[in-house]
Amino acid sequence: MNQFAQCRAMHQYYRDIFTRTIYLPEADVMPSHLVAEILHFWSTDYAAMEPAIMAAPVPPELEAEKALAIKHLLCAATLANQAFDSKKQGHQIAAAEGFGEQVTAHVVEALKRDDAVNLVVAAIQLLFRVGEIDGAVFLISNHLSRLSNSAPVLKILLLICLMEEDYNQAQVVIQTLTSDFALIEEESLVLLMIVCGIYKLGGCPDSFIDFRPLNEPLPLPDYSRYTWHIPKAATDNTTVLVSCDPNYFFEHAQALVASVYDTNGTALDVHLHIYNCDARCEARVREMQAAFPGLNFSLSSEVIAPVRGINVHYASRRFVFLRYALEQFDAPVMLLDADCLVRKPWADVHTRLDDADLILTCSDGAPLWERVLGGFIYARPTQANFRYLDIVARFIDRNLAAENNEWFLDQVALSFALDTLPAVEQMQIRREEA
């Protein structure tokens, strides 16, 4: 690993998830309201908190250097709270110049006074949260023997290894985590990292998420589950495919259809695939047909029983239907998230994309299970595309049947199915930055 470019580029969500909880019992010597504001309520008011922290009284028997170490670490935490994804409403906003260095300076001042394990772990978490990956890895390397049972550090290290594709080091971390399940703490993201790492190392996990469908020629899903309410008229137009439940249909999909009509007129068809579609949904679709004259509508549905992880079913089953729709329509299909809007004529966009047969979206700095994003796919009905989508559909269908209703299942399928394609077919896929 060098420079940690991928870790620096990854979404703040991933730098937050293993750094939200800071275990620092040493801070109990500080006024409880200050500690709570910083470590539990994630105060970002450094201007107010820093002087309060530094002036806070501590027990007289506590060594002055140890007290100062705790104070510097709390100052670092107050600064690092500014990096939380929740503080930026999910937007990726670059930190102010010198921000990382300021956090690092407090960490250095803390650890040169007291390098107790809890302080080192907290320091690693704070540096990782603000994107100071070099500093975090430096501390891990220097204190490795003392951190072998630290769950937060092992999880952070595994994420760094996977992001930077250092699978040799990842294997060591995976072995450590899986040797003591208490370290994993049943966190779904940790289990996701482990199974993805094992697959990249040549294994084939069959629990949590079952990777066997990537390599086994299983039968295709049972497409007889689909019910047609409004048949698809045969056209050569690209069909916009929108799959959602009734709530999302009424909250979002109607606006999406309106944006398709506003920007593309009747040049695109629209197919709505509504999970647990009821009479109210069908009636509304027929009203939309009248409201958008000339727009070719079609409607299908499937029944999904209430289950744990129903949102995973909603997100994933659309890719199973995509494979079926591509063959049934015998025309290009563009899958879109129901809560997006179309802003430009598709013909202009597709020309700019070299009239590609398969267009996938990606994101710089995405982890390996998000190499392909699920919000947009364009596919023509070619044999190469059928092969790819067959694998995706089998993977999703088998995992949902096994109740592996894990978040990111759809993107795991889309991302790892690419690895099974011949190199020449992979090279022909157009990848666009989301």
Task: Name every feature range the model reports, one short phrase each.
Residues 49, 249-250, 277-285:
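Short, charged/polar "capping" segments at the starts of alpha-helices
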Residues 280-328:
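Active-site-proximal specificity loops/subdomain of glycosyltransferases
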